[in-house]
């Protein structure tokens, strides 16, 4: 069995560390604006990196499900790490499986995360991914963390 992994940790000082392997992704938005995301450890991401196909073409590529590394294999998986110092009010982190991100653009997800609460955004993204996959999608897993101002 193969496992995809994406994880983030926010320490009490507000710093964020993330680690990623496979094709689950972590996205960082600030006030709905796309800031950064992880890159998949997949065959099509390798083709994108080489300039052989575009990111848009990768989404519909017939070999988009081939992973170059993930947890649960005999070889050591690739792990990418990233550090975000001092998250701020308006920052939002989304960790999700390919069954979610495959059906949205980065900007579309940012808009949903900006205008809805974390719970409402999670429900909307899951429901919309189910609809768009027409019953043929992958697993749907996600976690949303939004930094909102404290009530005074």
Ranges and model annotations:
Residues 12-17, 21, 27-28, 34, ...:
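Internal active-site segments that recognize and position negatively charged phosphoryl groups
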Residues 6-7, 15-17, 55-58, 82-85, ...:
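A generic local secondary-structure boundary/capping motif
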Residues 65, 69-96, 100-152:
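C-terminal catalytic subdomain
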Residues 25-28, 43-46, 103:
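A short local loop/turn or secondary-structure capping micro-motif enriched for an aromatic residue
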Residues 1-2:
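Short, small-residue-biased leader/transition segments that mark boundaries at the very start
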Residues 33-71:
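Glycine-rich phosphate-binding loop plus the immediately following alpha-helix
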Residues 21, 31, 40, 64, ...:
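ATP/adenylate-binding site constellation spanning eukaryotic-like Ser/Thr protein kinases
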């Amino acid at each position: 069995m193969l496992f995809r992994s994406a994880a983030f940790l926010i320490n009490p000082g507000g710093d964020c560390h993330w680690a990623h392997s496979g094709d689950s992704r972590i996205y960082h938005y600030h006030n709905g604006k796309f800031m950064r995301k992880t890159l998949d450890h997949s065959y099509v991401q390798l083709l994108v990196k080489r300039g052989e196909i575009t990111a848009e073409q990768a989404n519909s590529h017939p070999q988009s499900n081939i992973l170059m590394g993930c947890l649960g294999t005999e070889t050591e998986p690739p792990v990418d790490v990233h550090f975000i110092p001092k998250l701020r009010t308006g920052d939002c982190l989304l960790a999700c499986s390919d069954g979610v991100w495959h059906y949205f653009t980065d900007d579309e997800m940012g808009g949903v995360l900006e205008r809805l609460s974390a719970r409402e955004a999670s429900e909307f993204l899951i429901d919309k991914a189910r609809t768009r996959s027409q019953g043929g999608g992958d697993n749907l897993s996600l976690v949303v963390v939004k930094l909102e101002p404290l009530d005074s």
